[in-house]
Amino acid sequence: MSNCRRLLCRQLSSAYLNYLPFYFLIYRPFSLYLSSCEYWQSCFSFFFLFFLFFFFFFTFQFLVAFPILLFKVSLNSTLTKHVRPIHQRTKARSLTHHCIPKRWNIHFFFSGLLHKTISRIFSWIGNTRQVAPTKHTPKYLLNTI
């Protein structure tokens, strides 16, 4: 297995291990609870589960994943300080651009998903709002409003 593939496997497995507490603490017990009784049809239980999921999701994100991310970023910056600039590297070392750099950590993908979806929703709401043109509105924007 090449170094690139090993690095990718390690990042994927650590990202997967970060989300294992969700499965055992939230999803598994409540799926068993819902499959064992008829309360899943009521609105109360649905909103209760919804609240619980988001509560645990945010607490996990900010108490566990975010400090890990900060530590990894600081560790990466201290580890990569000794690396020579690209123009000073040899041909053999320049082949490492096929690997995923350590700075593009797979954790950024998972932790950024929630923020990305929320910001997209808000930008969609902002873009669909009707805005009346003023006298300062440029002419090229008048037919877009």
Curated annotation (Swiss-Prot):
Membrane topology per record: Single-pass membrane protein
Residues that span the membrane, as ranges: 46-66
Superkingdom of origin: Eukaryota
Keywords: Membrane, Transmembrane, Transmembrane helix
Keyword Transmembrane part of the UniProt annotation: yes
GO annotation, cellular component aspect: membrane
Subcellular location: Membrane
Name of the featured protein: Putative uncharacterized protein YNL179C
